[in-house]
Amino acid sequence: MGKIIGIDLGTTNSCVAVLDGGKARVLENAEGDRTTPSIIAYTDDETIVGSPAKRQAVTNPTNTFFAIKRLIGRRFKDDEVQRDVNIMPFKIIAADNGDAWVESRGNKMAPPQVSAEILKKMKKTAEDFLGEEVTEAVITVPAYFNDSQRQATKDAGRIAGLDVKRIINEPTAAALAYGIDKKQGDNIVAVYDLGGGTFDISIIEIDSNDGDQTFEVLATNGDTHLGGEDFDNRLINYLADEFKKEQGLDLRKDPLAMQRLKEAAEKAKIELSSTNHTEVNLPYITADATGPKHLVIKITRAKLESLVEDLILRTLEPLKVALADADLSVTDINEVILVGGQTRMPKVQEAVTNFFGKEPRKDVNPDEAVAVGAAIQAGVLSGDVKDVLLLDVTPLSLGIETMGSVMTKLIEKNTTIPTKAQQVFSTADDNQSAVTIHVLQGERKQASANKSLGQFNLDGIEPAQRGQPQIEVMFDIDADGILHVSATDKKTGKKQNITIKASSGLSEEEVAQMVRDAEAHADEDKKFEELVQSRNQADGLVHATKKQVEEAGDALPSEDKEKIQAAMDAVDTAIKGNDKEAIEKATQNLIEASAKLMEIAQAKSQAQGGDNADAGKQANAAADDVVDAEFEEVKDDKK
């Protein structure tokens, strides 16, 4: 069985790790980096992922996608999505089923389809390191992801050609990375995870006893639309407003200018974590009738902190809720772990320190801990890591809509998973032959205020008075936190397994089609790579042949020169096209046309070899006249 890899599919950056010699190892991508920007760009003839996609974003803003994780498993009409519609340079659209999709060059794409490109790069990175095909993975998600978002993440894995063996919560993965080497004792750890697009807090008990380790999540909370991207946007808006005050021009109407502004704002934010002031300097940011305009604005750390103060405060309320749900106080927390790049901001660290009354640990890499934890969980599943038990929870309550549009909960939030729950329901009217079961996720009493996961009808109920039929509804949450529902008519004993047909999400057919498309693109990518290789070989041969023709000079007959030149011209013409066979044929013709040239080069080489042999004889003769002498080493005491 091949290795199961661990992938942190992040909003801003992604990371892949694998167990190597019993230890989790973070892998470097093709660019030599341990993290990969979660950016995907579509051009006329290829899909670009990671740093290369980020570099070309300024010239291709409408077809370069970032922070796609904020759209995964979401409805277009969601408030969070509508906020992004107004600020993203790319097009966010409503799919036929109401989901939030994106559009590039007229192609409509689901977020899992776009995210799959990042997962494919992570898969390739692992395959290059391991030297074998990778087909299985553990993928992390924010702890506060709902059922739709978790299912969409699994779909992304499938489209990328991965069998997702487990979906694991990011804070839990970070706790695994932190606690795996802690051999003794019982620790209660708070994992504060503020990433690029999401925020989570998990309270986790780590019990290490005689080599056995249990990681039990006591409570989790968070906000799936709060992260570093929001911090960036505050700074972007400030810079755009300041420029408008100075120049009277609104940069928000210029996608190219906004892309440059985004890069500069992100860079300035990072710099202000280690310095008290910086300058954003963007020459030729835009132009009007009076000429080009330049943006030069100084920013202090204090200014940035004032712009994002409310965002930092927003992270504190979930901390209070998680502690209350775990029935703990801040004094019960032994260690605080910071995860996610945004936690490098000093003001964030200060807020966390003040809340818990203790300094967070500095020995956990906030960018890599989640991927390391995913690799450890992969090791647990494959049997390579033993004596580790992970007990995670469902972040939100699950239930169904009952009379009066009330949500009746079957499984409470922070219940350890996997778990099952059942409850008996009945009909609301006499002789009712079918019931509609509306499955919900959330904490509100009013059904419509919660997340709808879908609904199904149970038909064939025997006619009876209202309240007499007994229908047992079973909720089953698997280890990935994904819900399965079944229903049983207790009178007949007939059980029916129900697959929720959610109003949102990708159907089985859509996922299968996307998998086929991805496989087709894989073939295209391979052919493109082979074409480029043929072009490079042909180009190299032309360059070498030209050099040899010059070196041969008059020794090469003019007839052969003409023949070689014609063959080189044919190669140059073939290289400009996309026909690999034509390039290889032209290359072979050039090799054959250069036969005389090869003979001249070989003869010249042999002649030089003869000269070298004569020179060698002279050198040996001179060596016979050399007299060996004793010598004494003189040491310089002044050194």
UniProtKB/Swiss-Prot annotation:
Induction: By stress conditions e.g. heat shock. Residues 625-639 have a biased composition (Acidic residues). CDD domains: ASKHA_NBD_HSP70_DnaK-like. Keywords: ATP-binding, Chaperone, Nucleotide-binding, Phosphoprotein, Stress response. Residues 606-624 have a biased composition (Low complexity). Belongs to the heat shock protein 70 family. HAMAP family: DnaK. Acts as a chaperone. This is Chaperone protein DnaK. The lineage of its organism: Bacteria, Pseudomonadati, Pseudomonadota, Gammaproteobacteria, Alteromonadales. The gene is dnaK.
